[in-house]
């Protein structure tokens, strides 16, 4: 598989990730994540996929829109890293809607010829 194809597939995965977050699509998110996926929030809290998706579904995390400024991908065989930068309209932890400049540092691995998110770390830019 050409490197460019993998990079484009991973960029599309990032876009799909945000679409699933906005629509609260549990099945879609799980399809994008490895079984051992975890998210590290800006606060330093680490959550498993189950914990994070539960918070998404119960309204702890609400995402309304995402405009992607930049997506950088580096592929190394069957693993990859990605940095996505997006302006996100969100309301989290009971707060009001705010626009955030969110940076996600992701790790990925290839499972059965499909790229899966293995971790993400949230920060701002």
Language model: regions and residue ranges:
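A beta-strand edge to alpha-helix "cap/lid" segment located at domain peripheries
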Residues: 2-23, 27-31, 36-125
